Amino acid sequence: MAESLSLEALRRHFSHLPQGLLNHLERVSQLARQLAARWEVNPERGALAGFLHDVARAEDPAWLLAQARELGLVVHPVEEAVPVLLHGPLAATQVERELGLKDQEMLAAITWHSTGHGGMSRLEQVVFLADKLDPEKEGYYPGLAGLPALAEEDLDRAVLRYIQWQINHLLEQGGMIHPASIEAHNDLIRRTRGR
């Protein structure tokens, strides 16, 4: 349960991960805590989900695909082509099994932090954006200057802006777009219409 988890316990449990990834997990955890407090989400849940979102990110793409199949996860054709997208669902499965995390909203935030999905909760949006706002990724997402300020003003619009950028970027690169991202886009258009 989330109540029994602490960042210190998570740091010990995942100390085997590469240092660069651990640093990212710490930054995202801190950003998620701050965004959660701003948007009246439990900051501790934000910090914990932020730390856990990428615990399977260092795994080889072939392993991610094989592991997803072995666990019986539904693998979308886009995930078959781009197995790195499975690191969120596999991280959620891992923390549920290894740590006993049962908080479904936290597990969803971990699962969907790469693609988003329709009907995202505030916690899911917080973790999604905290991952994208990691200062070490600055410059990685050209055209998204101002996203941190927007995340403080309107969480829905900030997530929408990132997802629109992501979809456009993938289209320009000839990449595949996960249907969950399209569902997130359409849902956020509906939510923000008229604002």
Regions found by a protein language model. Name each.
Residues 168-195:
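Charged phosphate-binding loop/patch that engages nucleotide di/tri-phosphates or the phosphate backbone
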